[in-house]
């Protein structure tokens, strides 16, 4: 935990200059920047007196243009994505096909005769927001709280932080968008409850369940659809207009559809010289999409383990559509909080949090975040992350583990810190062993491991075996001996090696599962020796030798081929009636 040091200003003729920090909502469709003073939020306006700045980047005659609704759109969807993912995802490829540098080994886009990474491109949006704020506030702006989707992975978080850093920002905090929205509604003021945040923006849909305990926010469940938003509703309306009124599927027709949608949020009908459409027709057209979001929301609530909620918070301009509020109320019969402009709820929360972090007149006690992920080494050297980087503390996470081999009487736990996929690439924090376990078959032991970080950043790890009632607890300080520079180096290495690490992990998981397969079938063969002929045993042993050799080569393709060959040939042996082939890896 960090405590803000309070410095009393000296008695001089010059008033002490206040620090300034802004809140930024980097949205899929639009972005906003705001500043809070004495808990009153002022949203910075751009050229043309607009608060919503389209998150688009275009180059015209080598001049950078931000927010003209042309050029590259939906940059936010590209955070954390690899070149391979872009090429294999139709919707993502469509976003960047005109800019993609297919000759690069990593994801880069061609802009103004430059090859730029996503973070470098997104930085241009941050620079634009920063410039607008500095012009209006007549002050240098270097500190910011930035909102991110609750589902953002470490790579995506790293890229958005890098983009902000390139733009000249010191990122005080990354906070989840649902947390920011709840903060904007004042739910941080010693309130307790569970809130559902329904966020339907222009390009994405996210839903989160927040548990709030006296100012501590915890996202306990998330769900969503990264390819569903207000833009998809626009497409449905456009298609209807084209068919109904014999209009071309053009940008002009799309703008007409958007105008109709916006008008029908507060009127019963929309009419002009070209088209006419009423609210009932609109609701019939978009009902399947709205129903889809309700289903996702219900799934999220089920995942949270508790169906009870104290309120629904609406975020995103698309939630202005009355049908959405109606369907949410039908589904949950709960109070819907919508008195803050849904386009601005997230940035308002970010601005309020920014003020809370730097205001010198407040004796603020800040809740810290986990600087690097914490996890356990699994069999094969794989890291199982328990608490992810940037998780707010205090926090406690429980996971269950089991034994890999038969008759294990102890489990060794190796505690690690870092973002890499393999234990050898992470920082070792501590080791301990849970001893005296009853000898049982592999997989039957149930060891419950709890990672708990208190408000002072002290990590306590406890392991409890349910059958024997054996337990062990240790305390470690995850930040001991590691400074900010080392953290940055570890994050940079994780970013550079993300693709290789992921491939290595997949291979190791393949090997572990294959070794388990070999062990299980060898055990079955020993039990069935008297039922098999010598030729059958010879065939099976030859197949096993192929699999074992494939594992030794660490060739994932060869491993899969050897298993496939085994499954194919074993069908010709009577043992197939005893060994369930469906249990083999597909």
Swiss-Prot record:
UniProt keyword Chaperone, yes or no: yes
GO function term, MF aspect, one: ATP-dependent protein folding chaperone
Listed Gene3D superfamilies: 1.20.1270.10, 3.30.420.40, Actin, Chain A, domain 4 (3.90.640.10), Substrate Binding Domain Of DNAk, Chain A, domain 1 (2.60.34.10)
Family membership: Belongs to the heat shock protein 70 family.
Leader sequence segment: none
Stated role: Chaperone involved in the maturation of iron-sulfur cluster-containing proteins. Has a low intrinsic ATPase activity which is markedly stimulated by HscB.
Protein name, as recorded: Chaperone protein HscA homolog
GO biological process assignments: iron-sulfur cluster assembly
The entry's keywords: ATP-binding, Chaperone, Nucleotide-binding
PANTHER family per record: HEAT SHOCK PROTEIN 70KDA
């Amino acid at each position: 935990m960090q405590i803000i040091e309070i410095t009393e200003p000296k008695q001089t003729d010059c008033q002490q200059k206040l620090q300034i920090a802004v809140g930024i909502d980097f949205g899929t469709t639009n972005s906003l920047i705001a500043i809070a003073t004495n808990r009153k939020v002022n949203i910075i306006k751009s050229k043309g007196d607009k608060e919503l700045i389209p998150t688009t980047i275009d180059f015209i005659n080598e001049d950078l243009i931000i927010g003209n609704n042309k050029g590259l759109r939906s940059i936010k969807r590209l955070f954390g994505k690899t070149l391979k993912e872009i090429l294999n995802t139709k919707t993502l490829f469509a976003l960047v096909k005109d800019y993609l540098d297919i000759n690069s080994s990593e994801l880069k886009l061609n802009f103004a005769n430059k090859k730029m990474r996503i973070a470098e491109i997104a930085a241009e949006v941050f620079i634009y927001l920063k410039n607008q704020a500095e012009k209006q506030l007549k002050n240098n702006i270097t500190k910011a709280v930035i909102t991110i989707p609750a589902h953002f992975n470490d790579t995506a978080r790293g890229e958005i932080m890098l983009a902000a850093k390139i733009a000249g920002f010191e990122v005080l905090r990354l906070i989840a968008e649902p947390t920011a929205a709840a903060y904007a509604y004042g739910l941080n003021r010693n309130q307790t409850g569970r809130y559902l945040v329904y966020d339907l923006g222009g390009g994405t849909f996210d839903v989160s369940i927040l548990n709030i305990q006296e100012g501590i926010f915890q996202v306990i469940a998330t769900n969503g659809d990264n390819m569903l938003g207000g833009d998809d509703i626009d497409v449905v309306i456009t298609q209807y207009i084209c068919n109904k009124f014999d209009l071309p599927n053009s940008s002009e027709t799309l703008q007409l559809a958007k105008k109709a949608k916006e008008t029908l949020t507060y009127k019963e009908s929309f009419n002009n010289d070209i088209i006419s459409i009423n609210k009932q027709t609109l609701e019939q057209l978009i009902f399947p999409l709205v129903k889809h979001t309700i289903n996702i929301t219900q799934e999220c609530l089920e995942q949270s383990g508790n169906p009870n909620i104290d309120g629904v918070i609406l975020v995103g301009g698309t939630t202005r559509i009355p049908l959405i509020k109606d369907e949410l109320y039908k589904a949950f019969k709960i109070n819907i909080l919508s008195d803050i402009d849904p386009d601005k709820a997230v940035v308002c929360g970010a601005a309020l949090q920014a003020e809370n972090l730097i205001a010198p007149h407040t004796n603020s006690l800040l809740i810290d975040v986990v600087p690097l992920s914490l996890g356990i080494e699994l069999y094969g050297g794989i890291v199982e992350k328990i608490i992810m980087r940037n998780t707010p503390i205090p926090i406690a996470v429980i996971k269950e583990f089991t034994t890999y081999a038969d008759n294990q009487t102890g489990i060794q736990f190796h505690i690690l810190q870092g973002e890499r996929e393999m234990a050898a690439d992470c920082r070792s924090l501590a080791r301990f062993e849970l001893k005296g376990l009853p000898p049982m078959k592999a997989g039957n032991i149930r060891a419950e491991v709890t990672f708990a970080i208190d408000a002072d950043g002290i990590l306590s790890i406890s392991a409890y075996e349910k059958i024997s009632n054996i337990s062990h607890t240790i305390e470690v300080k995850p930040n001991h001996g590691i400074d900010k520079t080392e953290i940055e180096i570890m994050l940079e290495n994780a970013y550079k090696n993300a693709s290789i690490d992921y491939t290595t992990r997949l291979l190791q998981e393949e090997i572990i599962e294959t070794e388990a397969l070999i062990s299980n079938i060898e055990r079955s063969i020993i039990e069935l020796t008297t039922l098999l002929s010598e030729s059958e045993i010879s065939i099976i042993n030859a197949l096993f030798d192929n699999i074992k050799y494939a594992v030794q080569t660490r060739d994932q393709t060869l491993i899969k081929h050897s298993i496939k060959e085994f499954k194919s040939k074993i069908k010709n042996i009577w043992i197939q009636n005893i060994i369930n082939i469906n249990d083999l890896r597909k």
